[in-house]
């Protein structure tokens, strides 16, 4: 976990599960200056600004300095988001918490294979959840 706290993390989507994960990162010592959230909704961005994280409505600008990009959007908008980010994630680790989105689909639309699939559960909303993880063979344990 300590290595993650030294990374710049961008969340594409700032809904409930993203907010729970952000809260967990902050609670474990991640500086808020290392967290960026891109969300199209002004009310969500305002709520996240109260946590002192960077917010924007521009997905491309949000990922510019990211080491890790967390896909936290609704399944119905995922394809559009992935097309927008296609070819822009070289060297970045992609983590998807999108329900029903498999690694092959995400990798094909992004043109990358450094992807981890995470399935958080609702207790994560109160920092007590368990998460299932799956990664392709080329993703290191770091």
Model-identified regions with their sequence ranges:
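Anion-binding (especially nucleotide phosphate/pyrophosphate-binding) glycine-rich loop
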Residues: 47, 65, 142
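Short beta-strand and adjoining strand-loop segment in the mid-core
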Residues: 36, 128-142
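Rossmann-like NAD(P)(H) cofactor-binding subdomain of soluble oxidoreductases
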Residues: 42, 51, 59-64, 68-133
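Generic secondary-structure signature for well-ordered alpha-helical cores
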Residues: 27-30, 87, 111, 138
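Short coil/turn segments
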Residues: 14, 120-123, 136-139
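NAD(P)+-binding Rossmann beta1-loop-alpha1 motif at the extreme N-terminus of oxidoreductases
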Residues: 1-57, 61
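Conserved active-site and cofactor/substrate-binding residues in soluble primary-metabolism enzymes
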Residues: 12, 16, 73-76, 101, ...
